[in-house]
UniProtKB/Swiss-Prot annotation:
The modification Phosphothreonine is found at residues 286, 350. Belongs to the protein kinase superfamily. CAMK Ser/Thr protein kinase family. CaMK subfamily. This is Calcium/calmodulin-dependent protein kinase type II delta 1 chain. PANTHER family: SERINE/THREONINE-PROTEIN KINASE. It catalyses: L-seryl-[protein] + ATP = O-phospho-L-seryl-[protein] + ADP + H(+); L-threonyl-[protein] + ATP = O-phospho-L-threonyl-[protein] + ADP + H(+). InterPro entries: Ca/CaM-dep_prot_kinase-assoc, Kinase-like_dom_sf, NTF2-like_dom_sf, Prot_kinase_dom, Protein_kinase_ATP_BS, Ser/Thr_kinase_AS. CaM-kinase II (CAMK2) is a prominent kinase in the central nervous system. It comes from Danio rerio. One of its GO terms (cellular component) is neuron projection.
């Protein structure tokens, strides 16, 4: 059926200057012609998006439509046109919260309390609506306007997910390194508490101008986070009230089940009794540290942008860290056209590609385990990795579709388990296609090395495709297709 090209955005809105840019999108100021009201239009080039990216875009729009709160950047319209999708948001003109703080003449604990209160109000609304943001960080905390006392607005729901109640599940490895929670780093089921951990990191920075977890080496940074290894060093923390430290401790609790919730945090004395509990003393040292923290965030962001534009990836740090200032170290950037080169240049880069790489590696690993079970003649181990309804096309079945594992039992009991000679298998050029969150397909060439009856080394080759499905957190092979040599080495 022929579809007419929608031009509703072009008809209803007038576009103006560029406000920002992403990999597949640009943000521009726009005006609704009928009302004269100004907005920010996120313009996504859908021609360049994969099916998975399309799903993410739909999810982001669906989530943003749900959220209507004074401390959240609101989505007003979502329009698809030929090759382009428009998301029309509030136009927020106050810039980043952290940039505004360093321009203030006066900044105290009480101000930090007011900032985190607004962030917590936004997080509470998200959680009440069944949304987990997953990427709370300074870059996503904006101010509604340049006016004094302008509202803090939570932005960028590109990584946000929908959850049912207090559901905990593995939703993928996503976020920004210094703000990731221990449960995400441990690849454990997670949910709303990940946002509260990030709030703890943000509050820590709001009070002293540097983050609780930092290391030049990303692996060591992750070890620190998993161990909850942060402290309140002198002299800067000596002037912070015990109540502020108590709230940070409750947010940076390793066990997510014991971590404070947004609703509980809003009832904490340091928040709800601010005027009598939070210190009013001006924190000049915090402002100075925060200036350096902001400068490095911007510099590293610029370096990353340049690297992405020029494809010049380097793992060396181009500048040294100023003494006495801590910062989180960044993410791995993968450039498919440039091999697996890595960069540790940006503190503020969101990771999701790392999750995709990890999931693909998981599929390769489970395929290797399955083949190891075949080579060792371990039928019980084989059936644990295979779905009971496994279907297959294989040379042994002479072109017939086989269902279940009983057909394979014969080979395990009469040939594979009887062989005492070593068998070695190599998977060449494995290609993994991820199909949503819980399904994947892997294609590869399988080389099997073995000793024949005359003790002569032999090699067999087969071409295989396996389809995997994850049930209850466990990958199972549901179908495979093999051509070429059979599984059992020929004599």
């Amino acid at each position: 059926m022929a579809s007419t090209t929608c031009t509703r955005f072009t008809d209803e809105y007038q576009l103006y200057e560029e406000l920002g840019k992403g990999a597949f999108s640009v943000v521009r100021r726009c005006m609704k012609i009928s009302t004269g009201q100004e907005y920010a239009a996120k313009i996504i080039n859908t021609k360049k998006l994969s099916a998975r990216d399309h799903q993410k875009l739909e999810r982001e729009a669906r989530i943003c439509r749900l959220l209507k709160h004074a401390n959240i950047v609101r989505l007003h319209d979502s329009i698809s046109e030929e090759g382009v999708h428009y998301l029309v948001f509030d136009l927020v003109t106050g810039g980043e919260l952290f940039e505004d703080i360093v321009a203030r003449e006066y900044y105290s604990e009480a101000d930090a309390s007011h900032c985190i209160q607004q962030i917590l109000e936004a997080v509470l609304h998200c959680h009440q609506m069944g949304v987990v943001h997953r990427d709370l960080k300074p870059e996503n905390l904006l101010l509604a306007s340049k006016l004094k006392g302008a509202a803090v607005k939570l932005a960028d729901f590109g990584l946000a997910i929908e959850v049912q109640g207090d559901q905990q599940a593995w939703f993928g490895f996503a976020g920004t390194p210094g703000y990731l929670s221990p449960e995400v780093l441990r690849k454990e089921p997670y949910g709303k508490p990940v946002d509260m951990w990030a709030c703890g990191v943000i509050l820590y920075i709001l009070l002293v101008g540097y983050p609780p977890f930092w290391d030049e080496d990303q692996h060591r940074l992750y070890q620190q986070i998993k161990a909850g290894a942060y402290d309140f060093p002198s002299p800067e923390w000596d002037t912070v009230t015990p109540e502020a430290k108590d709230l940070i401790n409750k947010m940076l609790t390793i066990n997510p089940a014991k971590r404070i919730t947004a609703a509980e945090a809003l009832k904490h004395p340091w928040i709800c009794q601010r005027s009598t509990v939070a210190s009013m003393m001006h924190r000049q040292e915090t402002v100075e540290c925060l200036k350096k923290f902001n400068a490095r965030r911007k510099l590293k962001g610029a370096i990353l942008t340049t690297m992405l534009a020029t494809r010049n990836f380097s793992s060396k740090n181009p500048y040294k860290k100023p003494d006495g200032v801590k910062e989180p170290q960044t993410t791995v950037i993968h450039n498919p056209t440039d091999g697996n080169k890595e960069s540790s240049e940006s503190t503020n880069t969101t990771i999701e590609d790392e999750d995709i790489k990890a999931r693909k590696q998981e599929i390769i690993k489970v395929t290797e385990l399955l083949i190891e079970a075949i080579n060792n003649g371990e039928f019980e181990a084989y059936t644990k990795i295979c779905d009971p309804g496994l279907t297959s096309f294989e040379p042994e079945a002479l072109g017939n579709l086989v269902e279940g594992t009983d057909f394979h039992r014969f080979y395990f009991e009469n040939s594979l388990s009887k062989g005492h000679k070593p068998i070695h298998t190599i998977l060449l050029n494995p290609h993994v296609h991820l199909i949503g969150e819980d399904a994947a397909c892997i294609a590869y060439i399988r080389l099997t090395q073995y000793m024949d009856v005359n003790n002569m080394p032999r090699t067999m080759q087969s071409e295989e495709t396996r389809v995997w499905h994850r049930r209850d957190g466990k990958w199972q092979n549901i179908h495979f297709h093999r051509s070429g040599s059979p599984t059992v080495p020929t004599k």
